[in-house]
Amino acid sequence: MKTIIIMGNGPSLRKIDFNEIRKYDSFGLNAAYRVYKKLNFYPTYFGSYDCNINNKHKENFESLIKEDNSIKRFFLIGNYELKQNLYGKDIVMNERFQKINFSNARNNKLSGSFNEFNDFGSSGANAVQTAILMGYKKI
């Protein structure tokens, strides 16, 4: 049974031994991408389920998708108005970009697929839900 570690981007991240994290699949969130190059660490997956963060970091998220790194898949919801179309067609069509039909309405029911993805209210909770959809049991 594979394990995945969900990582936020708060100050506690500074105390993490990334050599230990490398032993597992990992999921990075939001603005944590800013330290990946410096640490020579990229998570297995990366996402942002916050529309404001998607708006603010759009260009950087697009660059992260385009660059050569070990991130297998990106989970970016876009913004309220454009949803994932916030990103350019080349990004949305990228094989590492996960299509998500994100419901802005808060719903505590676990999603059955990315076609009807319920908002659990935080990026961390939505990353856990994403890991479950990908088949992870140890989160």
Protein language model features and the residues they cover:
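N-terminal glycine-/serine-/threonine-rich phosphate-binding loop
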Residues: M1-S26
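Acidic/Gly/His-enriched mid-domain segments of enzyme catalytic cores or analogous surface patches
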Residues: R22-D25, A31-I132
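Glycine-rich phosphate/pyrophosphate-binding loops
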Residues: M134-I139
